[in-house]
């Protein structure tokens, strides 16, 4: 479903604010998983199909189940709660992440996840596909006692800003004159969070929902009144979340999402009307940090981005779908890449989205990947001359020096680029039969994860470096190709 006013019934606002009685007409249903635990769920009210409030850790996350119920009561959203699994160390909201082929049948106690069952429960609660999932969690981290952290999927920076501002306004209004902690909200992608949720984002519930928010509250408040206050604040805030994300009354930029059986494709439109250039992250989950980098670089530069998530051995039965070419392969094997129907379909979908994002001819395509076998950035190219490569390298060195300065704790990574220099990772498969051959010019960046992504600070610095490099290099490369650049990077 696309998130626009056309998909929203005219009575939605009334439904949102006056559905506290909806629960009376939406019975709670139960499903047991023998020897492991049980689910409780309730279908979304009419007009709110696709929206689900989840509490995958039940009572193990203090009061998260009751908070999820109250939010579902208030909004009319569907409800999905899991009980009993966490105490047995059974994952609910994500599968077991596996890099190699694994058996399709499991028996207790080997089984470590009930994600497949939870996904079915979400579908029942949503009355179909999950357009918006909101998970409720509690933090056991004492350092996170002063804030609410929100992990997200499918949100733009502008949407995150609007949601943070809405929370601040609701909190300040309801907490005025009351003795309660003033919790800040830290929300992705606007801010980095301390909560590690990569499995949920790349393989779990935030992968399969078109848009998703996982909310983590402090373990406890100083008083029962504080608990009640923030339950009310969050309930009212989620009212706003549903309107902002589904109705988009502010006309904010939104990410277009294509959900597929083994993953998802996200398209971030150019914020500056740029045509002919696209950033790609075809291995956004397998190369774990590249999805986030592509999204942040797109925001900083205004260049359109297409990001693939999922399609890893976890989703594809031990195979990695290559996405930027019509093949798949088992990781760490020396065998050839396999052509398959599913790989061709996923590649076609990715290719078509790249061309749609380019808004015309694909003059320059930029692929972002990561690797861990060397310490240099390697850039494979198509259609780039030695002179152009030399200028890109010179720009990179200058920008790296400006941004890193004398900062000794972040390595100054060298860059090797074709055809100026020989590289080990030549991206030949994508050059011969993949996305790299379709653009007039292509650059395939392999970033050394142990250097550029080792810490949050390194990620931030190299994201800035990469964005600044594209701001300088892209206009030059496009002017060499077309004589002009449509749109502005500066």
Question: Where are the predicted features?
Answer:
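Bacterial N-terminal signal peptides that target proteins for export
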Residues: 2-11
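Hydrophobic alpha-helical targeting segments used for export or membrane insertion
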Residues: 12-17
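N-terminal catalytic or cofactor-binding beta/alpha core of small enzyme domains
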Residues: 23-467, 471-489
